């Protein structure tokens, strides 16, 4: 997605393909620069009232990776259970950071929470959440090649925050995010037809 040019030891990051109205370098950043990183948690499972008649979304790795927008989850929480979690606002970007599904991602379509296998970015006002989702999806294979090999792959919250990325200014982020979202929607529509 990017071209690296080394001119007197200066690395310049610009995309190979770009909307014509944008120019200039992309800024080097870390995932933590996109917003606040939140690791999920699990309400006590021994207390059935945390889950009984649940209406609140609570994502686990099984809920991520097939579609971008998280509109339902396999496990739902009651109001009591939800109050015991770290809540995420609509638009947060969710990424599995432990286990065989590491790197699977999704985006919150409404306020929700996750279990501890997921790190989420509550995207700040200086960044576009759609762009952040696609930037992480694009870079994750590179991240996987750099993590330590172990029986259960894991990226801790602190390591996740430090993963490198590149970003343009907000207006370009928004245009890229909208464009890629539109492509995803068209692909999904075509898949339904087929």
Protein language model regions, located:
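A short beta-sheet element
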Residues: 54, 60-64, 71-140
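Short beta-strand/turn micro-motifs at beta-sheet edges
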Residues: 4-6, 106-108, 148-153
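A short glycine-rich beta-alpha junction/loop motif
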Residues: 11-15, 97, 112-119, 149-171
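Amphipathic alpha-helical segments with low aromatic content
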Residues: 1-27, 168-194
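Short coil/turn segments at secondary-structure boundaries
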Residues: 44-51, 149
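Non-catalytic DNA-recognition/assembly elements of restriction-modification systems
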Residues: 16-42, 66
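Proline-centric
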Residues: 2, 20-25, 119-129, 141, ...
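Localized chelating/binding microdomains
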Residues: 27-34, 134-138, 165-168
């Amino acid at each position: 997605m990017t071209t690296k040019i080394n001119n007197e030891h200066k690395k310049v990051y610009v995309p190979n393909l770009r909307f014509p109205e944008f120019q200039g370098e992309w800024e080097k950043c870390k995932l933590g620069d996109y917003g606040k990183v939140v690791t999920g948690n699990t309400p006590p499972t021994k207390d059935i009232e945390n889950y009984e008649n649940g209406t609140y979304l609570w994502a686990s790795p099984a809920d991520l990776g097939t579609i971008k927008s998280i509109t339902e989850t396999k496990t739902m929480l009651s109001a009591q259970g939800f109050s015991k979690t770290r809540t995420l606002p609509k638009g947060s970007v969710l990424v599995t950071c432990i286990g065989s599904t590491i790197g699977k991602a999704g985006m919150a379509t409404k306020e929700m929470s996750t279990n501890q296998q997921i790190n989420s970015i509550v995207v700040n006002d200086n960044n576009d959440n759609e762009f952040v989702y696609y930037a992480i999806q694009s870079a994750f294979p590179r991240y996987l090649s750099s993590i330590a090999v172990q029986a259960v792959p894991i990226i801790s919250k602190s390591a996740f925050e430090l993963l490198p990325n590149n970003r343009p200014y907000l207006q370009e982020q928004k245009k890229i995010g909208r464009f890629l979202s539109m492509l995803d929607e068209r692909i999904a529509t075509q898949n339904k037809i087929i």
